[in-house]
Amino acid sequence: MALSFLELMELRVVKALVDRDVTLQHVRRAAQVAAERFNTKHPLASRRVFTDGRHIFSAVTDAAEAPDVVKWTAAEIDQVVAGPVFDQFLSEIEFDSATSLASRWWPLGRQVPVILDPAIRFGAPVVAGTGVRTSTLARLARTTSVRDVAVAYELELAQAHAAINFEQQLSTA
């Protein structure tokens, strides 16, 4: 079974919530309400609906700078909290300005040059700005030095290391 990029983003949110004891029933209910409220098939992949890992929230406004957000609790859906709390979570994801849906993900944060973008290599993890798959670099690094891999693909050594480390983390997960 293949997942779309948006489904992957939604599963990331669901996993984070379930790992912190939020019930699937609550996640499902919140997703259904958000899908209707924001007219989207992928509410948990939307900039307007996001999580801090324990709760589900939705943006009250589309303001770019620290919008107020609505916290969705099991008992009540409209509890406003401050937007800046979620800067770290939202900073890992780039959202499409037209749809407000996730369009690019930095799975280790923006400081690490590894991205998933459905428009690049069908969403496979790549070195940002290059389109070079992290899996290709990791595979080559098993038989040659990281420096040689970086030179072969015209990457900085730090980019090659980041890609290889990312793949190693995937293999141990």
Where are these regions (language model features)?
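Conserved AdoMet
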Residues: 5
